[in-house]
Amino acid sequence: MKIFSWVANKISGKQEANRFPANSSAPYRANVSDCRKDEFSDWPQSLLAIGTFGNKQIEEVAQVENSSDNVQSVQDTVKFTEEEVDKIRKEFETLLAIKDQAEAQRSHDDDQVGLQKRADGEDNEKHIRQLINKRIIVSKSKNSLGKKGNTLKPRSVASLLKLFMCKGGFTSVVPEPRNTFPQSRMEKLLKAILQKKIHPQNSSTLVAKRHLDWKPDETEINECLEDALRDLDDDGAKWVKTDSEYIVLEM
């Protein structure tokens, strides 16, 4: 209602100003301004928020209200008892301990992961080195076998061609010089001499049988050989000494 009355007064004031002359306008304006101040002083601060008037006052009022709310909240926090404060402090301590444990566990896990990665890397390096060494050994062995095969084949073929062309084919092995005189004949001769010395009066049949079955000792053989050599020396025969045996030559 005051707003409507203010608007009506403003309109009536303008009309009155138009009625009065210019000389009498000054005192009237002073009266109008005083009336406006009185009207504005009676209005509440909430109505001034509609227009542009009273912004600074509204901000000051808001700051005062916020400060009062903060003071009230501080007073409310001060109302905690000692038991509640201890309980809150314990909860904070447990939270901090849990946080420290989690950080320690995380750092331990990171260390374990790093060690595992290092061990895996070392194992992989060892495995790679072993594979490289095996490949090097296999390649070297293949190269050596290939070289040996290439060098042996021409030599064998060349040697076979030389033997075939020079000697007219493959011949048997040449016997050694001491195999020219058969060993069986020498054995027969020695056994006959020994048989004559041991059994001089037996017949030829008994001599043949005992010659096949008799096996003298080394001492008997040596004695018989010495006696045979003496008899041969007395008869005028000669013994020719070779590398392995004694050969009897009749004069």
UniProtKB/Swiss-Prot annotation:
GO terms for biological process: positive gravitropism; regulation of growth. It comes from the Eukaryota. Residues 64-105 form a coiled coil. InterPro entries: LAZY. Keywords: Coiled coil, Growth regulation. Introducing DRO1 into a shallow-rooting rice cultivar enables the resulting line to avoid drought by increasing deep rooting, and to maintain high yield performance under drought conditions. Induction: Negatively regulated by auxin. A motif (IGT motif) lies at residues 46-52. Belongs to the LAZY family. IR64 cultivar shows shallow rooting in an upland field. Involved in the control of root growth angle. Involved in cell elongation in the root tip that causes asymmetric root growth and downward bending of the root in response to gravity. This is Protein DEEPER ROOTING 1. It comes from Oryza sativa subsp. japonica. The gene is DRO1.
